[in-house]
């Protein structure tokens, strides 16, 4: 992990296309701006973790639904023969 010190109105570059600018420093918060290409997704970490958890839940539901559909198809095709 790289640790840097920056003052208000200073920035860091990540590669050539991402810039993190320190806008304001308060006692208990730092306001930052991130300039990045539109195809780069940027999330607050708590939002990102929520998205990951929701995706996992969705996969479990899909797995359950696929099992139900498979069971229905098996039942249908057994009765066809």
Swiss-Prot record:
Listed GO MF terms: mRNA 5'-UTR binding
Keyword Methyltransferase assigned: no
Main location: cytoplasm
Record note on quaternary structure: Homodimer; the beta-strands of each monomer intercalate to form a hydrophobic core, while the alpha-helices form wings that extend away from the core.
HAMAP family documented for this protein: CsrA
Function: A translational regulator that binds mRNA to regulate translation initiation and/or mRNA stability. Usually binds in the 5'-UTR at or near the Shine-Dalgarno sequence preventing ribosome-binding, thus repressing translation. Its main target seems to be the major flagellin gene, while its function is anatagonized by FliW.
Name of the molecule in the record: Translational regulator CsrA
Protein species of origin: Borreliella burgdorferi (strain ATCC 35210 / DSM 4680 / CIP 102532 / B31)
């Amino acid at each position: 992990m790289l640790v840097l010190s920056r003052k208000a109105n200073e920035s860091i570059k990540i590669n050539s296309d991402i810039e993190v600018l320190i806008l304001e420093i308060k006692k208990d918060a730092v306001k930052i701006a991130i300039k990045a290409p539109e195809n780069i997704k940027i999330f607050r970490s708590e939002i990102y973790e929520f998205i990951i958890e929701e995706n996992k839940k969705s996969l479990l539901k899909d797995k359950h639904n696929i099992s139900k559909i498979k069971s229905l198809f098996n039942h249908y095709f057994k009765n066809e023969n």
